[in-house]
Amino acid sequence: MSDDQVHIVVHDRGRDLSGVVRPGESWAAAARRTCASVHAEPAPRDLSGEVKEFVVDHDERLTVRAMTRGDLPDVLRWRRTDHIRRWWAAEGEPTPEGLEARYGPRIDGLSPTRMWIAEVNGRSVGFVQDYRIADYPDYALLGPDSDAIGVDYALAEEWSGRGLGPRVLWAWMTRTRHRFPDATTYFAAPDHRNAASLRMLAKAGFTAGLWFDEPQEDGTVDTVVGCSLDVARVLG
């Protein structure tokens, strides 16, 4: 095997199934081919290294579904924890009325932003929001690709630190691949101090790029790191 090949390993119940990415093949397709005998869908464990690590989990099923108003009490509870609050502070103190005003139109399909709930075996563990960056012209000027799909996310504190983050993003990405088949890039811009979020993105296949100053709703400015995912290379 040549040194310029991308190597894949799929972890499955103590076994390591190894392979390489063929020319023109995505990392996801290579992982599925490598573990074809397992008859299960691989998800990323860590795509940030030279060897792209995937895992097959036979016990935890991770999915994303559309958010409903019935999810708002959970979202309110999550948003009030220090774990999430510091990174969403610009939106103000979370209240039931505030969340209804912000998320209600998104739930109803009246906003370019859509809301999703991440679940593990049917239990809600966090939320994701996405949007076509071009629908927000001020933000589009800051990003590298105005046609990219932007994404923000938060995991409940009690579910953090379990390696779920990359798999949450993967579940969202595989769904988004069908919703926006023409999109070539997914884009996230976490605060430069949010090391956990940056690591989560890297493990899911994103590449960190330029730092830039992003104006916030409360008039402050945060320095964020633009992170992009090449859809064709990672997902196919």
Predicted segments with their positions:
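Alpha-helical and coiled-coil interaction segments, frequently adjacent to or embedded
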Residues: V6-I8, A43-S48
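Acyl-donor (CoA/ACP) binding surface of acyl/acetyltransferases
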Residues: W27-A29, A36-V38, G49-E60, A66-L72, ...
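N-terminal strand-loop-strand
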Residues: M1-V20
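Residues forming the ATP-binding cleft of Hanks-type serine/threonine protein kinase domains
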Residues: R79
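Short hydrophobic/aromatic beta-strand or adjacent loop that forms the aromatic wall/cage
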Residues: Q5, T113, D222-G226
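Conserved GNAT-fold acetyl-CoA-binding loop/helix
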Residues: H83-G104
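The catalytic Nudix box helix
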Residues: D16-P44
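A short helix-loop-beta-strand connector motif used in the catalytic cores of GNAT acetyltransferases and
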Residues: G104-I117, G126
